[in-house]
């Protein structure tokens, strides 16, 4: 049997892509960037390999978006921050919006949990403290309505 290094370039790229996908879900954009970086001399072959993986349902931006949204919610990120992170990873804007909308998360409750984790359950005693907490929640991706 041939070693992976001796395989034809297309099989070598597919093998590396499968290794990456076995560890975690990747967006097509992420996977393409990693494969082109690993195999710059075979960059034109990466597109067809990715198309085959998508056709075989081994790579899915939908699955990646769902898994990534769950992970970011678990880390206490709000919808704006999640949307931005998905777009940075090459997920289509409409798919990002759809995935966040389908997510059954109470953003108000999550904002409260995040604030209590950071600041405890002590109420704000000054305007400056309230502004500090609001900025923190905005940084985490919550909108003004969810912060109130």
What is each of the regions a protein language model found here?
Residues 1-148:
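An alpha-helical, amphipathic repeat domain used for nucleic-acid recognition
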């Amino acid at each position: 049997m041939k070693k992976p290094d001796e395989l034809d370039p297309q099989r070598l790229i597919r093998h590396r892509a499968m290794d990456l996908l076995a560890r975690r879900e990747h967006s097509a954009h992420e996977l393409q960037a990693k494969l082109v970086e690993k195999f710059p001399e075979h960059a034109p072959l990466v597109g067809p390999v990715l198309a085959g993986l998508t056709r075989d349902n081994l790579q899915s931006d939908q699955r990646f978006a769902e898994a990534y949204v769950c992970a970011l919610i678990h880390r206490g990120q709000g919808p704006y921050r999640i949307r931005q992170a998905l777009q940075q990873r090459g997920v289509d804007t409409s798919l990002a919006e759809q995935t966040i909308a389908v997510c059954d998360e109470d953003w108000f409750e999550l904002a409260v949990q995040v604030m209590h984790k950071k600041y405890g359950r002590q109420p704000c005693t000054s305007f400056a403290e309230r502004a500090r907490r609001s900025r923190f929640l905005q940084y985490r991706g919550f909108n003004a309505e969810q912060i109130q």
